[in-house]
């Protein structure tokens, strides 16, 4: 893709950011819709090159991974904020006495700070699980093509780095065909 084509494609994509689209546009999926709109704005010669060395298979896998990655970052930041608030509150209640319960009955006298720190510990384990999931999700599938890679020489690692991924998924079938990372994410947020 020439610099001129890239500028036209990027300009078209930028102009689409704030547009609203009809759900029933006739496009097979969001990728076809975006490609059609980019071609309308940038022209067929430039816009038609947008998917060079890419397939919908690796793009869909990429989109899902980027969305989950963003969601995990948001959730982890919320967890850290909540943990910080619980620890701060616990510092202010180091001498506050409260009843501790077991089997729906008061069992012992304890400290409110002890209770708060127990909740912080639970949330930290949630954070730790999500962070591990993030590491599994944050691998780029781009360049895997539909299932067997691309014949166009590309630097998958460079693309991955530009998009904020820690690395690439080496096996093209794994990159485009599996969704175990989605199941892992759903399982982690279900806890």
Q: How should each PLM-predicted stretch be described?
A:
Residues 163-191:
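Acidic, glycine-rich loop-and-beta core segments that form the ion-binding/anion-interacting portion
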Residues 1-149, 153-162, 167:
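A helix-coil-helix interface module used to build multimeric assemblies
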């Amino acid at each position: 893709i020439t610099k001129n084509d890239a500028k036209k494609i990027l300009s078209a994509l930028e102009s689409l950011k704030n547009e609203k689209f009809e759900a029933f546009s006739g496009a097979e999926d969001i990728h076809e819709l975006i490609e059609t709109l980019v071609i309308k704005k940038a022209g067929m010669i430039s816009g038609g090159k947008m998917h060079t060395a890419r397939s919908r298979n690796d793009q869909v896998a990429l989109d899902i991974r980027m969305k989950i990655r963003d969601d995990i970052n948001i959730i982890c930041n919320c967890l850290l904020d909540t943990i910080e608030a619980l620890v701060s509150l616990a510092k202010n209640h180091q001498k506050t006495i409260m009843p501790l319960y077991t089997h729906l009955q008061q069992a012992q006298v304890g400290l409110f700070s002890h209770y708060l720190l127990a909740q912080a510990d639970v949330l930290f384990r949630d954070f730790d699980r999500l962070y591990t999931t993030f590491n599994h999700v944050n691998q780029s599938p781009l360049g895997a093509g539909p299932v067997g890679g691309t014949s166009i020489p590309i630097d998958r690692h460079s693309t991955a780095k530009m998009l904020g991924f820690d690395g690439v998924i080496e096996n093209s079938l794994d990159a485009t065909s599996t969704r175990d990372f989605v199941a892992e994410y759903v399982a982690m947020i279900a806890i």
